[in-house]
A protein has these predicted regions:
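HEAT/HEAT-like alpha-solenoid repeats
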Residues: 30-31, 75-76, 129-133, 193-205
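Eukaryotic acidic, Ser/Thr-rich intrinsically disordered low-complexity regions
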Residues: 164-206
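Structural detector for internal amphipathic alpha-helices that build alpha-solenoid repeat scaffolds
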Residues: 5, 12-27, 36-37, 45-60, ...
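Acidic carboxylate motifs that coordinate Ca2+ or other divalent cations, activating on Asp/Glu
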Residues: 106
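Strongly charged, low-complexity linkers/loops
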Residues: 127-146, 154
């Protein structure tokens, strides 16, 4: 049975084992098969194992096809490629991620892009990345807001100044998001719900 056939089996546990085997015994011929499966694999655990298997291969071989996937029209292909690039952590992926994918209209892709950008940004780009991400404060639902806050917190201290600036925004939602993020910077273990609650309390009563 080929790797492609093994990854197409109906049993999720069998697909998981196939991905694990591909990472345990890396082979350059597996790379396009693993990447193609990332685009359509429905099971989260299997997708994580596909990422692990790709990370086990040399970055010089995986980076080019993963970067190509960032231009896919399929959102899962983009998000999985970003997730894998974040695990590889190679700065060579930076130009392909920022800034375009940071503003992806698909929230899952955007959230993964923020995390990947933090993981691969060269030191000289971190302050600029923080400034770019800060323009997105106020976006999305609870999970989106929390993901953006965690990304900005991971960029501290480079993100401190821009967060303090945005915390004075005339837009209440943006201001709360910035204030809550500053709380996460100060205490990464604070629950996001608590950070947002305390940030709202800090707003002046209108």
């Amino acid at each position: 049975m080929t790797l492609a056939e093994a990854l197409a089996q109906g049993d999720g546990s069998a697909r998981l084992q196939a991905a694990m085997d591909a990472g345990t015994r890396p082979d350059p011929s597996f790379i396009p098969v693993l990447i193609a499966r990332c685009e359509i694999e429905p099971d989260f655990s299997v997708r994580e194992m596909l990422t692990w298997a790709l990370v086990r291969h040399p970055a010089d071989l995986t980076l080019p096809p993963l970067i190509d996937e960032l231009g896919s029209e399929v959102s899962q292909a983009r998000s999985q490629a970003l997730h894998t690039l974040s695990k590889i952590g190679d700065e060579r992926a930076w130009p392909a991620i920022a800034p375009a994918l940071l503003f992806d209209s698909d929230d899952t892709v955007a959230r993964t892009a923020w995390r990947a950008a933090v993981a691969v940004a060269p030191e000289a780009e971190r302050a600029g990345l923080a400034a770019t991400l800060a323009t997105l404060l106020g976006r999305g639902d609870r999970d989106v807001r929390m993901s953006l806050a965690r990304a900005l917190a991971a960029l501290a201290p480079e993100s401190d100044a821009v967060l303090r600036q945005v915390a004075t925004s005339a837009d209440a939602a943006v201001r709360v998001h910035a204030l809550a993020t500053l709380r996460i910077v100060a205490d990464p273990d604070e629950a996001w719900e608590t950070a947002e609650f305390e940030a709202r309390k800090a707003l002046p009563i209108e």
